[in-house]
């Protein structure tokens, strides 16, 4: 599956979290915002290449964070920079969904929502593992939280 290329997202829709000016968290956040707004197509293409994205048919903001190599490279970085990357990943995730529903082969979207730690990701991935039944043919799966967003 190829990403529909529509150009870059507007950096102004990626909210800043208000980190202390000059802090590493603020610098990482700005890097993520800038990269998302200048390389949207490339980041979304990278997302489709992640095995867990199921060729971009599974859309999830936590997984979207993995398109940033510095974040994906270690558990320590994922813990340390999670808040700095959250809003950029959320906007990229929304853009991935927006583009996915424009694909002519997508006929439905399965939404999986629940609170943090409820097992949404496990359930979502198990749907794909049982795909021999054809249950997800021509579908995308969008997983999200029903708790207040981080931004």
Q: Where do the model's predicted regions map?
A:
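Glycine-rich phosphate-binding loop of ATP-dependent small-molecule kinases
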Residues: 1-151
């Amino acid at each position: 599956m190829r990403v529909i290329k529509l150009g870059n997202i507007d950096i102004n829709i990626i909210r800043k979290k208000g980190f202390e000016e000059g802090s590493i968290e603020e610098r990482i956040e700005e890097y993520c915002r800038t990269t998302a707004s200048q390389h949207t197509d490339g980041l979304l293409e990278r997302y489709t290449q992640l095995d867990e994205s199921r060729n971009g048919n599974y859309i999830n903001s936590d997984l979207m964070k993995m398109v940033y190599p510095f974040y994906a490279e270690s558990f320590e970085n994922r813990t340390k920079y999670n808040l700095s990357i959250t809003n950029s990943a959320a906007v990229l995730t929304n853009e991935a969904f927006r583009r996915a529903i424009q694909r002519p082969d997508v006929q439905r979207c399965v939404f999986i929502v629940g609170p943090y730690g409820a097992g949404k990701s496990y359930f979502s991935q198990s749907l794909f593992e049982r795909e021999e039944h054809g249950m997800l043919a021509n579908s995308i799966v969008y997983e999200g939280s029903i708790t207040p967003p981080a931004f």
